[in-house]
Amino acid sequence: MCKGGNKVNKIKVRFAPSPTGPLHIGGARSALFNYLFASRYNGEMVLRIEDTDLERSRREYESEIIDSLKWLGLGWSEGIDTGGPNEPYRQTERLAIYQEYTKKLLEAGQAYYCFCSEKELEVERQDLLDSGQMQKYSGKCRQLSMAEREEKLKQGIKPAIRFKVPAHQLHIVDDLVRGRVSFDSDDIGDFIIVKSDGIPTYNFAVVIDDVLMGISHVIRAEEHLSNTPRQLMIYDALNFRRPEFAHISLILGSDRQKMSKRHGATSLVQYREMGYLPEALFNFLALMGWSPEGEEEILSPAEITAAFSLERVAKSPAVFDINKLNFINQQYLKKIGDEELKEMLKPYLADSKYLKKIEQMGEERYELLVSTIRDYLVCLADVKEQLEVFFGDIDYAGDAREVLAGEGVIPLLQAFKEGIHKVNKVEEIKQLIKGITKTLKLKPRDVFMPLRCALSGQAHGPDLSSYIAVIGGEEAIRRIDRAIDFIKSQ
């Protein structure tokens, strides 16, 4: 369970999103892995909000993130919405706490005031770039005397505070996913821990929060690996015990580039709106980087939780395979009863142009519609596309045109028209078609195909008798008449 030298009495993890936008798929997976790890080992999870990016952070995104996590089926023992022993859980409400630890570092000579302007720093960066040197701060404000610092403060210059990086230190992390990773402090310049506006930087605040909240394991995306050496230095400078680290791989698009908007929907709320089920996304996200011991891939949240371990989390990048998500979602949809599915589809029908038709067809025919289309649904929003099959404009083109041009189609359609006004149940319609097949001495295919093409304009589709029962006899007759007129006009 816990490789490395740190022994912990209780597992405690955290998910700490920045409320700068909706919950991204990558963030949702990180939250899920934290939740699974805590649940698997009877631990606790904290939901913390890292909102030190004042320009982009929004309270509405906080609410959306919390709602998305709960919809996915995740829970936490303490956090921004539930409270707990380590309040507050929003970083901008913890500034006094960070100031206390900033003071300790300053007094110990492990941090210092930096008066460099952004313009000066940009010139310094450009000079390093032009000379091919490593991009890191020169440390010139490290050398300022007390008198020089006092003078700059008197001038009203608001300083940032930098951490004084110790020279010639090797920082080693036995990462629970990536194995041993080492960092040389000489590759890292003195870094800012508090900006000139008094707001702490991520690398500083996250360490203080994790320690004070008792976080034992930091499970996060691989892109945070480069932040780790800076955080380790702060842990050591303040004599804090380091947590265990586990950096999970990036999520790539189908082209094996980092997932972005060009690959399609990227936020959890978008998939929710499209009608993907939370259990399916839970299942799918768990399999992006983690694999169970067996071959089975359709696993319930309880089964995934019972089997989860960081030892089975891969180092290699996870690829977001929309076809796999679609397959998993279809499997979960198939498990849902018709009655429940009817209710789940209602929000997706509310703005449909065919809503009036559905309301007029009655409960029995609506139930038949749902049971007929359910196997064609990849996600709930697909119901709109399926309604086009039943109620959309018919275009006799392609295969349909060719089938309707066949010999003996008009007598077949007329025979169907004469019989359909007498029946309306699925079984009755099946018997009608069977009788026509026998009377006209045709093969079943030579009856089904022309009827389907005449009624829907398509050569393939849902069960024909169910389709006819859904649209109703009156509409079926109208379509048959139109098909006959079309054939005669050719």
UniProtKB/Swiss-Prot annotation:
Its main location: cytoplasm. The lineage of its organism: Bacteria, Bacillati, Bacillota, Clostridia, Eubacteriales. NCBIfam families: gltX_bact. Belongs to the class-I aminoacyl-tRNA synthetase family. Glutamate--tRNA ligase type 1 subfamily. Keywords: Aminoacyl-tRNA synthetase, ATP-binding, Cytoplasm, Ligase, Nucleotide-binding, Protein biosynthesis. One of its GO terms (cellular component) is cytosol. It catalyses: tRNA(Glu) + L-glutamate + ATP = L-glutamyl-tRNA(Glu) + AMP + diphosphate. The keyword Ligase applies. InterPro entries: aa-tRNA-synth_I_cd-bd, aa-tRNA-synth_I_codon-bd_sub2, aa-tRNA-synth_I_CS, aa_tRNA-synth_I_cd-bd_sf, Glu-tRNA-ligase_bac/mito, Glu/Gln-tRNA-synth, Glu/Gln-tRNA-synth_Ib_cat-dom, GluQ/Sye. One of its GO terms (molecular function) is tRNA binding. It is an enzyme of class 6 (ligase). Monomer. Catalyzes the attachment of glutamate to tRNA(Glu) in a two-step reaction: glutamate is first activated by ATP to form Glu-AMP and then transferred to the acceptor end of tRNA(Glu). It is found in: Cytoplasm. This is Glutamate--tRNA ligase 2. HAMAP family: Glu_tRNA_synth_type1. It comes from the Bacteria. PROSITE patterns: AA_TRNA_LIGASE_I. A motif ('KMSKS' region) lies at residues 258-262. It comes from Syntrophomonas wolfei subsp. wolfei (strain DSM 2245B / Goettingen). A motif ('HIGH' region) lies at residues 17-27.
